[in-house]
Amino acid sequence: MKINVINQQELREINSKKIKDIAKKVLLNEVGKGNFELNILITDDKSITEFNKYRGKSTPTDVLSFSYGLSEPVIGDIVISVESIEKQAPDFGNSFEEEFYYILIHGLLHIVGYDHENSEEDAKKMFEVQDQYFHQLIKDRRR
């Protein structure tokens, strides 16, 4: 398993080692060991808006996940906007760092097959798992 962190922004310092550690823990737990790569692009609102056009939207978002399948050499790409995270963190009572890792976990779960847009049941399951990882790996209380 190889996790590539590409930092294309200068707004915030990013801890690439911690990003990789969290990603590896979630992926090991969800899919086990594997010979695959995952790319995590850290960017700003302007850049993520360009990626979001793929979804037919012309606005920024906090995270986008592009899953290519767990049997592929590169299982996916995650794009995270530090600007969006910085704006929304106070709304959830999180520091920037806490919100960043919460959103990272969200993106990782999409890569391994979780979804929250198809049904309420799927959404409930995904957010429960996301909260569990957040509680276990980042913050000792639920969001």
From Swiss-Prot:
- Which GO biological process annotations does it have? rRNA processing
Binding of Zn(2+): at which residues? H106, H110, H116
List the Pfam families hit by this protein, alphabetically.
Answer: YbeY
For this protein, the record's PROSITE patterns field holds:
UPF0054
Q: What is its EC number?
A: 3.1.-.-
A GO CC annotation recorded here is: cytoplasm
Enumerate the UniProt keywords alphabetically.
Cytoplasm, Endonuclease, Hydrolase, Metal-binding, Nuclease, Ribosome biogenesis, rRNA processing, Zinc
Gene Ontology MF annotations: metalloendopeptidase activity; RNA endonuclease activity; zinc ion binding
Matching InterPro entries, A to Z?
MetalPrtase_cat_dom_sf_prd, YbeY, YbeY_CS
Cofactor list: Zn(2+)
Provide the cofactor note recorded for this chain's UniProt entry.
Binds 1 zinc ion.
Tell me where in or outside the cell this protein is found: Cytoplasm
Function (record text) = Single strand-specific metallo-endoribonuclease involved in late-stage 70S ribosome quality control and in maturation of the 3' terminus of the 16S rRNA.
Q: Which HAMAP family match?
A: Endoribonucl_YbeY
Q: Which family does it belong to?
A: Belongs to the endoribonuclease YbeY family.
Recorded protein name is Endoribonuclease YbeY
Species of origin: Petrotoga mobilis (strain DSM 10674 / SJ95)
Organism lineage: Bacteria, Thermotogati, Thermotogota, Thermotogae, Petrotogales
